[in-house]
Amino acid sequence: MTSSTEIHTGDIGEALCYYRLLQMGVPCRIVNLGATDILAILDDDVVIRVQVKTAHQTFDPRYKNRSAFYGFNVCRGSKEKRRFLEHEIDVFACVGLEDEAIIFYQAKHLLQKKTHKVKAHLFSDSGVTQDSWSKAIKPLLYT
């Protein structure tokens, strides 16, 4: 069973992602429909299905140089983990809560994984949200 803390964290991540997309001028809506958390509409005819994953910053205690990272669960299910399928989503939004920043990825780059670790310092770049969104959607606009 998913804890209320995990649900709360996920809701905050979705709200932050929605807010950042609107700040960037991207028309979107929170939908929570199947595998899709947010629908973004580009150029009035391209629909982008976004799956939002949210994490808190953590450290790996096994190493002396404990650099902070975010660990994202990029699959579905609270007990039995199942990978998303390519036809279900277009973009993953990995939300780093402490930095209030997002790194977007084309879904196909993370579909074969169950977890995805990102060094926390990558979220501190002021342009990371805009830059990663542009990079993630570019191939979807020209297919």
How does the language model describe each region?
Residues 1-34, 40-143:
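Mixed-charge (Asp/Glu-Lys/Arg
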